[in-house]
């Protein structure tokens, strides 16, 4: 059995790490390079960097910040936001990312997933899905930083993304984002059941029990932001707890 992964997320706006609730009420948190170094040293399994306004502002990603972060860490590094072409993907990978997360552009042109997988490999191509419940047991895909409802069913989109060559899926539960009431298990487990590639749960972590709850299912990794940023949960302590709960996670290196 593969070890489950613990993944801190840096939501970056204008070169600073920020955090909000349900994709709104954005507050400044910290310098991304310093935070990245801290998570690398604490034993995070991976790091995610989202330029959260790039897509909505129709601009490219902050490659200079990506480069600075990449130089300071020795763990897998996923980058997303404002990625619309294979040229963008090439630039992000060249800047030090190991994986690229595609969201809005994939919805607008699904062929981008296929092109990325063919050119750079499925292991580099991650489909990120911002999903919101619009009826009981039905979730739609939202784009442009969660601002626009596409009307596309999230579970069907995950299956389509896999068929196009995505090697992994991040499920961002918009209703749970920043609420700290737990991950959206119905949504995330439904997607994990529907596909045969790794699924990362995102949105809602508030305590260590929430990590146990989500990783007890067929979900490969748990992504979180504010609980790590504000030292509410320490990664070494979280990993110790999960191992005690018989959930396989990589041992802390420090």
Swiss-Prot record:
Disulfide bonds: none annotated. Gene3D superfamilies: Aldolase class I. Pfam families: His_biosynth. One of its GO terms (biological process) is L-histidine biosynthetic process. Keywords: Amino-acid biosynthesis, Cytoplasm, Histidine biosynthesis, Lyase. It catalyses: 5-[(5-phospho-1-deoxy-D-ribulos-1-ylimino)methylamino]-1-(5-phospho-beta-D-ribosyl)imidazole-4-carboxamide + L-glutamine = D-erythro-1-(imidazol-4-yl)glycerol 3-phosphate + 5-amino-1-(5-phospho-beta-D-ribosyl)imidazole-4-carboxamide + L-glutamate + H(+). This is Imidazole glycerol phosphate synthase subunit HisF. Pathway: Amino-acid biosynthesis; L-histidine biosynthesis; L-histidine from 5-phospho-alpha-D-ribose 1-diphosphate: step 5/9.
């Amino acid at each position: 059995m593969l070890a489950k992964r613990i993944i801190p997320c840096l939501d970056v706006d204008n070169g600073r790490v920020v955090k909000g609730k349900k994709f709104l009420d954005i507050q400044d948190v910290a310098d991304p390079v310093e935070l990245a170094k801290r998570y690398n040293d604490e034993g995070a399994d991976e790091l995610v960097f989202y330029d959260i306004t790039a897509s909505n502002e129709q601009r490219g990603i902050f490659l200079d910040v990506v480069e600075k972060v990449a130089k300071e860490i020795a763990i897998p590094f996923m980058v997303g936001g404002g990625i619309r072409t294979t040229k963008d993907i090439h630039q992000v990978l060249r800047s030090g990312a190991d994986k690229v997360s595609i969201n809005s552009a994939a919805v607008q042109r699904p062929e981008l997933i296929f092109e990325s997988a063919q050119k750079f490999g499925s292991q580099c191509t991650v489909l990120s899905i911002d999903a919101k419940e619009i009826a009981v047991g039905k979730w739609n895909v939202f784009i442009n930083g969660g601002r626009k409802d596409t009307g596309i069913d999230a579970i069907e989109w995950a299956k389509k993304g896999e068929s196009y060559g995505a090697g992994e899926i991040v499920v961002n539960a918009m209703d749970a984002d920043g609420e700290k009431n737990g991950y959206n298990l119905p949504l995330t487990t439904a997607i994990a059941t529907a596909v045969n590639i790794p699924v990362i749960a995102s949105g809602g972590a508030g305590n260590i029990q929430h990590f146990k709850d989500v990783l007890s299912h067929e979900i490969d990794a748990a992504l979180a932001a504010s609980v790590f940023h504000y030292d509410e949960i320490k990664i070494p302590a979280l990993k110790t707890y999960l191992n005690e709960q018989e959930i396989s996670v990589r041992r802390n290196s420090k």
